[in-house]
Amino acid sequence: MNIIEVNNLEFEYRTYDEDGNVTECNKVLKGIDLEIPQGQFVAVLGHNGCGKSTLAKHFNGILSPTSGKVFVKGIDVSDEEHIFDVRQTVGMVFQNPDNQLVATVVEEDVAFALENLGVPPEEIRRRVDEALKTVNMYGYREHSPHQLSGGQKQRIAIAGVLAMCPDCIVLDEPTAMLDPKGRQEVMKTIKLLNSQGVTIVLITHYMDEAVQAGRVIVMDDGKIIMDDVPKKIFAQVEKLKAHSLDVPQVTELMYELKKSGVNVPVDVLTEQECAEELLKLKHGKLTAKKEEEKENTSGINSEVAAEIRNLTYKYSVGTPFESTAVDNVSLAINKGEFIGVIGHTGSGKSTLIQHINGLLKPTSGEILINGKNIWDKDSDIRAVRFMAGLVFQYSEYQLFEETVYKDIAYGPKNMGLSEEETDKRVREAAQDMGLDEELLNRSPFDLSGGQKRRAALAGVIAMKPEILILDEPAAGLDPKGRDTVLDEIYEYHKNSGTTILLVSHSMEDIVKYADKVLVMNRGRLFCFEETDEVFSRARELEQVGLGIPQITRLSHILAENGMNLGEDIYTIDRAKKRILEIINA
């Protein structure tokens, strides 16, 4: 039996003038036909703007079709008389858990929808307890949601939907803002619910999540272009990449080996599958050679750009909620370095970086920029913020001006620069971030997601900070958009010599770009070393709630079975090179 049926669905967003006349139409869904059987686990992939979220919002009646029909258990979602039946059948979980939590106590938040439905108190108590136990959060029922980690908050959001006893849960990028441990927690919950018969529709940009589904749908330009089991979808590497999508690292490794003439299947999805196939190959022995260090193209020197001395920061000092976010951290960052900053949610990463440009003032300790304490009485904290630029996660929320040009120019103008110098910096920053000249006169709110992100970055770069701090600059972008933004940042770093601090939950991105990695754990500095050195401690990283690249996990499995690629396998290219050396030895 199908729980969701979509027949020739079309939807367009419309812009109206003051008189209610349509001034602009943007068709987002174009003739979608889809059936989802009860109990299925479906992953939906597609680049930003392809229509994934718009389609999902039709499943529980948040949006109504412009034309065509959507049925949930035979009920037309356009039928307003039965809209509450639809929404009780299909629950929805969004990307940002903070936008979904409404109460000050966990169990009250989970009970919120049930109270609105008029469910008897005894039944509310039973359902709330059951939902919290299902997502393994019963022990936190009396906690305040804002004190929980991202993964815990998202599980509370899922519990709130689960308490309504839906037959289907639609999750729109529920792990986009989570660390690796948080992602694992949420995916474990999703799979558990599916095993209990709940239909799951998961929208994601993470391919390792999509491979866990029973069915994968790929969208592009408002249409479904691929629909099959994960093995058959991800075996089509070139087609997926042409649509701005990625494949699991092990799938891409096998694809690259096959292109090099090695007889291996491409439709592998997990490290275990990949290892089994590689171990079948006849191979000689190879003494693993450590890869040469990355070429220094960024002008790193021993001159210190920023120094942190015995930094401690506490939130809510003097209240029952007092907590230490950063605990006695000391480190020095040299000029021209590209530093990756990693750590589990709540480890203190964001709190730490917000001290470098003076957004937060230490409870104790010192922050020095170019050898000068930024909180000395004679220090100009405003000037410090021009020297150390900070770009927040979802930086498009920093856009506010009428045009892209004015938005980028805002910082230089506030620095007191001349009109001529401001214009020069705006155009240079736009070029550095890959923004075409024609976009400068457009409203920033008319840009695509990736363009908005680059415009916000350009606004900080235009001030030419000596230190550029980036908090998850690629969060929420599709694989192609993510690579474009990060490549442009790296090119800017190489050309300008600017010191970069990149906060990320993607170990693959950190490995690709960072010279050194700063690891935070529970408010303390876990380690701060060269990238290769940090990721050679892969098992320790996993113990502190961090992920390691899938390709690294593969190398560990191979080593345990006699095929030693070395301790420094973090990229597909390096793994491919070592495997070819071994099988040809």
List each language-model region with its residue ranges:
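The feature captures the beta-strand-to-loop junction immediately N-terminal to the Walker
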Residues: 45-47, 342-344
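ABC ATPase NBD Q-loop/coupling interface
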Residues: 69-85, 366-383
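Catalytic Walker B motif of ABC-type/P-loop ATPase nucleotide-binding domains
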Residues: 169-172, 468-471
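Conserved ABC ATPase signature
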Residues: 144-148, 152, 443-447, 451
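Helix-to-loop junction immediately C-terminal to a conserved catalytic motif
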Residues: 60, 357
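Conserved ABC ATPase "signature" region
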Residues: 122-140, 420-438
